[in-house]
């Protein structure tokens, strides 16, 4: 392919200013700006991929509606469902254990 002029923006070859040559339907060659790709969101606990959260750069991500940014549950934007389930169960069991200890301590003391 032949060289194509860059008409808009900076001409520097940097990571944030990448361009790709594209042939338009009319047969003209133009330079299109290529966006930087974003990484997939991951669970903060087990590092599993959070599949249902939109994958895009932070500025674009902040403009998305809430349903695209997180899942509708506690810790939906940062933690996977498995880790949330484990958190809830461990908190519940810890609470139950504390109540049992209080009851047995009161029965032994009183």
UniProtKB/Swiss-Prot annotation:
Keywords: Ribonucleoprotein, Ribosomal protein. One of its GO terms (molecular function) is structural constituent of ribosome. The keyword Oxidoreductase does not apply. The keyword Transferase does not apply. Residues 30-41 have a biased composition (Basic residues). One of its GO terms (biological process) is translation. It comes from the Eukaryota. Pfam families: Ribosomal_L34e (PF01199). Residues 1-41 are annotated as: Disordered. One of its GO terms (cellular component) is ribosome. PANTHER family: 60S RIBOSOMAL PROTEIN L34. Belongs to the eukaryotic ribosomal protein eL34 family. This is Large ribosomal subunit protein eL34. It comes from Encephalitozoon cuniculi (strain GB-M1) (Microsporidian parasite). The gene is RPL34.
């Amino acid at each position: 392919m032949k060289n194509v002029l860059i008409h808009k923006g900076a001409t520097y070859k940097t990571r944030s200013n990448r361009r790709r040559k594209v042939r338009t339907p009319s047969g003209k060659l133009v330079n299109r700006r290529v966006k930087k790709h974003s990484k997939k969101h991951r669970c903060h606990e087990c590092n599993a991929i959070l599949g249902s959260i939109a994958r895009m750069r932070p500025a674009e991500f902040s403009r998305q509606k809430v349903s695209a940014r997180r899942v509708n549950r506690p810790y939906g934007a940062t933690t996977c469902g498995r880790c949330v389930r484990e958190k809830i169960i461990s908190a519940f069991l810890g609470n139950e254990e504390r109540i049992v200890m209080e009851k047995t301590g009161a029965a032994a003391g009183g």
